[in-house]
Structures are given as structure tokens and as C-alpha cells.
Design a protein with these regions (language model features):
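Short edge beta-strand segments in beta-sheet-rich domains
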Residues: 39, 99-101, 178-182
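Catalytic core of non-heme Fe(II) oxygenases with the double-stranded beta-helix
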Residues: 50-150
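Residue-level detector of short, conserved catalytic/binding motifs and their immediate flanks
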Residues: 42, 84-86, 90, 159, ...
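Catalytic core of Fe(II)/2-oxoglutarate
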Residues: 116-200
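Signature of the catalytic double-stranded beta-helix
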Residues: 1-49, 73, 77-80
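Short His-Asn-centered micro-motif
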Residues: 47, 88, 164-165
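Short, internal active-site loops enriched in acidic
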Residues: 49-50, 168
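A structural signal for well-ordered alpha-helical segments within the folded catalytic domains
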Residues: 9-13, 86, 156
Length: 200
């Protein structure tokens, strides 16, 4: 991994640089556990055609997280301490033009007991056989009934966006033959904490 971008602009370094520019006096570092174990600085994902993620959240602090760890186990993670958690996605390769309606759908919806009651185990296929997700049908009904606004994220290669990890979002399926390739990461901060942790 250390030599993957030799001779090129390293997108991981660019991400950390800009987080540092926006963070004021806070230190931006790769997350680590008290015993010294480090998290990954970012992850590269290859989303294949005809595959996507149903509604889900990514905040480690929340019971609706796609993590398989129990709520009790999650409180033991060093990244759990951060009140605010965000995800960041950089598009490296887009599917064929016209094969995808959008790259992501974001919902202006806070996690709550009603949404938590919609959680179910979903079969995803590929290397992630199953995960905790929000029931797509139930959530769509909830969104309509409560007039929850949505935003469709449409990216070009090189575009980077951030989203609140505690709000539901969807990665829609797309057609074609070319995979969508992204670099993704999460970061957390608390106003009073001098550090911003970045992890994948």
C-alpha cells in the first residue's frame, strides 16, 4: 500500500491534507486503539454492476450501524468517543455513462427508534454475505409518510463528498460492465477533542 501511488498524487494524502486545512488547531491522524493498533487510513472499493447497498448508516456510535459488533462492543472502539462522525467518498472511476441514476441517495433524517425498528439482516452477496441494514420497503414508506427530503449525489471522477454517517443513505445498483471505484474513509470529531480520527 505504501508504494501504490509512487510517482502519482496520493489521494489519501490529499484527503488528510484538506481535513487538516479545515480542522483549525486539531490534529488529523489515522485512528488508533489505546493498545497502539491502527485502523486503515482509507479503503478502496470496487462496486460491481447490479450491486448496491440498501438504506443504512455508518456511525459507530449508533445501534443502526452496519457493524456486526454489539452496541456494548462498539463502545469499546476508540472511534466511538467522537460525537460527530462523517463519511467521505472520492470517485476514482465511474460506471458507463447513463448506467447509474446517481452515486448515492442521502436522507435528511436523524436516526430514531422508528428507523431502528426497521433494521433487518440483508443478504448482499460477494464478499459481504449479510449485513444489518434498514428495510428498503419500510424505509421508503416512512420517507414518503414523513415528507423526508432526499439528495441524489451525482459524481464525476475526482469528485469528493462528505456526509453525516448517522443519517441513512443508499448506494443504488447500476447497470453496465464497468465497476464504480471509490476511495472511502470515515472521520470523527468532538468540539472539545484536540484530535480528529480518520479510519476505514
Amino acid at each position: 500500500y505504501e508504494h501504490l501511488f509512487d510517482g502519482l498524487v496520493n489521494p489519501v494524502h490529499v484527503l488528510y491534507h484538506w481535513l487538516g486545512q479545515f480542522s483549525g488547531a486539531k490534529s488529523v491522524i489515522t485512528a488508533r486503539e489505546p493498545d497502539g493498533k491502527k485502523y486503515g487510513p482509507a479503503i478502496f472499493r470496487c462496486h460491481m454492476p447490479n450491486w448496491g447497498y440498501p438504506p443504512h448508516i455508518d456511525s459507530v456510535r449508533n445501534t443502526g450501524s452496519t457493524l456486526h459488533a454489539s452496541a456494548d462492543q462498539r463502545t469499546q472502539y476508540a472511534v466511538h468517543r467522537f460525537e460527530h462522525q462523517l463519511g467521505g467518498v472520492l470517485l476514482l472511476q465511474a460506471p458507463e455513462e447513463g448506467s447509474a441514476s446517481c452515486d448515492s441517495i442521502l436522507y435528511r433524517c436523524e436516526w430514531n427508534n422508528e428507523v431502528e425498528d426497521m433494521m433487518e439482516t440483508v443478504y448482499l452477496g460477494l464478499d459481504e454475505p449479510e449485513a444489518n441494514m434498514i428495510s428498503a420497503d419500510k424505509f421508503e414508506h416512512y420517507v414518503q409518510a414523513n415528507s423526508i427530503s432526499t439528495y441524489e449525489v451525482k459524481l464525476l471522477p475526482g469528485d469528493l463528498y462528505f456526509f453525516r454517517a448517522e443519517c441513512p443513505h443508499v448506494i443504488p445498483k447500476f447497470l453496465g460492465k464497468r465497476p464504480r471505484i471509490t476511495m472511502a474513509t470515515f472521520f470523527g470529531y468532538t468540539q472539545s477533542d484536540p484530535e480528529i480520527f480518520v479510519w476505514s
